[in-house]
Amino acid sequence: MGKKSEKKVVEETMEVDEQPAVEPEAVPEEEPEVEDEDLNVPKKKKMEILDPKSFEQDPSNLTLILYEEDHTIGNSIKHILSRMDEVEFCGYNVPHPLEDKILFRVQTKDGINALEVLVKAFESVEQVFSTIRGKFEAAYEKSIA
């Protein structure tokens, strides 16, 4: 490196070093949390039926996307559905680990609405999770008493 190049690097470094430090009072305070409703931001979809026309023609076959969900709910729902007599097939897939969604497929016996069966499965999972939460909270209260 020549002397001119070295001098230029030193001058650039000095400019950066000579900038005044930020005072703690100058740091802006955190913004208060604002609800989406206040901003008129459209709410994100939680669920989407992939082919609504196909589902209307045959309500025993349902393929949908669950947004903001992962293996926790996917495997729980699949487990409950697989034990139901009305269900012929159920499965889920996480398309990509960085995407926050799962694809879910339910096929029921003829004449049985797959969406209604899926709702029953969600209610069962909700009941299981609330039971687990109740037992956990009781054990926690017992341990700190």
Curated annotation (Swiss-Prot):
Residues 12-39 have a biased composition (Acidic residues). Belongs to the archaeal Rpo11/eukaryotic RPB11/RPC19 RNA polymerase subunit family. Residues 1-52 are annotated as: Disordered. Component of the RNA polymerase I (Pol I) and RNA polymerase III (Pol III) complexes consisting of at least 13 and 17 subunits, respectively. It comes from Caenorhabditis briggsae. Gene3D superfamilies: RNA polymerase, RBP11-like subunit (3.30.1360.10). Its main location: nucleus. GO terms for biological process: transcription by RNA polymerase III; transcription elongation by RNA polymerase I. PANTHER family: DNA-DIRECTED RNA POLYMERASE I,II,III, DNA-DIRECTED RNA POLYMERASES I AND III SUBUNIT RPAC2. InterPro entries: RBP11-like, RBP11-like_dimer, RNA_pol_Rpb11_13-16kDa_CS, RNAP_AC19, Rpo11-like. GO terms for cellular component: RNA polymerase I complex; RNA polymerase III complex. This is Probable DNA-directed RNA polymerases I and III subunit RPAC2. One of its GO terms (molecular function) is DNA-directed RNA polymerase activity. DNA-dependent RNA polymerase catalyzes the transcription of DNA into RNA using the four ribonucleoside triphosphates as substrates. Common core component of RNA polymerases I and III which synthesize ribosomal RNA precursors and small RNAs, such as 5S rRNA and tRNAs, respectively. Keywords: DNA-directed RNA polymerase, Nucleus, Transcription. It comes from the Eukaryota. It is found in: Nucleus.
